[in-house]
Regions:
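Amide-donor transfer/coupling interface in amidating biosynthetic enzymes
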Residues: 29-129
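Cysteine-nucleophile active-site neighborhood
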Residues: 1-48
Length: 129
């Protein structure tokens, strides 16, 4: 299974976007809206544009062949917490889960279909599992 964008968020227990609505609960934690400010500066939401994947887990099958620091395309207002299964983080208003995986349940917050060669690599990795 591969959840993309809000599909990654649904893999968690829920979100502040819809209080009382349960997520699938495949991963622990709640998704939250980006803060209005970060380190004393206003933070725009939604987070739209290119940003880097950091701290890529070496054993990630989904991100195999993707270099730490590779750029992917985001458009989202809610973010998933960093958890044990996080395969990569991105920093925007603090660190959030950009990709996660446990066995055959995976998710990416970014849009691989808009992320050029890096996105194609991620999709190819998933299809070849």
């Amino acid at each position: 299974f591969l959840g993309i964008c809000v599909g990654l968020q649904w893999l968690f227990e829920g979100s502040t976007e819809a209080e009382g609505t349960k997520g699938l609960g495949a991963f622990s934690g709640m998704c939250e809206h980006f803060p209005a400010t970060y380190e004393g500066a206003d933070l725009k939401s939604p987070h739209v544009g290119w940003n880097s994947l950091e701290q890529i887990r070496p054993d990630s099958r989904l991100l195999r062949g993707v270099a730490d620091g590779a750029f992917v395309y985001f458009t989202h207002s809610w973010r998933a917490p960093v958890v044990q299964e996080t395969a990569a983080v991105t920093n925007y208003g603090g660190a959030f889960t950009a990709a996660l995986e446990r066995e055959n349940v995976m998710g990416v917050q970014f849009h691989p279909e808009k992320s050029a060669n890096v996105g194609l690599r991620v999709l190819r990795n998933f299809v070849e599992l």
